[in-house]
Amino acid sequence: MSNNQSSFDFSGARVLVTGGTSGIGAGIAAAYRAAGASVTITGTRSSTADYAEDLSGYTYLQLDVENMEQVDAVARAQTQIDILVNNAGIALPSTGLDEWDPEVFTRAVNIHLVSGFRMARGCRDALARSTLAGGASVIGIGSMSSYFGIGIVPGYGAAKTGLLGITRAMAAEWGPHGIRANAVAVGMCASRMTAASLANPAWSAPTLARTPLGRHGVPEDVAGAVLFLTSAQASWITGQTLPIDGGYTISG
């Protein structure tokens, strides 16, 4: 746990992290738990016993974000929530699917944009009841495809670009109800979704060469930014997307 993460105090806060069983989601969930929050995570398997990772200390909910009925049900169940982190996703091309196929494109948009919108909308009233210092928050996990065209993932890219817009819309509409909405756009960061890309030098080497800080990210890099954006220190920040990318977006 890095010092900047442990410096936050979220004692008593109730946090939901979708896709919190591995990768970036697991890093975010662990950071909130270390800061004193009560953390609920979601995953696709039946129970925590089905995972190799130690998920003790979390409340666990099974959720397939492609199943909108499940998404709506999980959202309705959140009668007390202060922070929602929409993180769950899947790299469809890594499963052999082509996002240029219209049906796969639609799946990608549903997974990475529509599900998060429905989750946030379903949690809105409970978030509005939050008394968390700095206000309740919705966080979306974006990516470099929010800014750059990446040919292999047109659906994912469309969804992550759309995330910037829906984040601003939620911030404008829900701000008067005490709810802030922000996003982070994550660069090449170690996770289950990026494992194949990081293992491929033809992909990872050029990315690293363009990154001024000279390394790929780790989940803790993202977690620190997310905790800041949902903290009282960021109580006047809403509708923004913060790149967490080692400087990739500013490198020519």
Locate each region found by the language model.
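Catalytic Tyr-X3-Lys loop
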Residues: D98-F117, I139, L163, L213
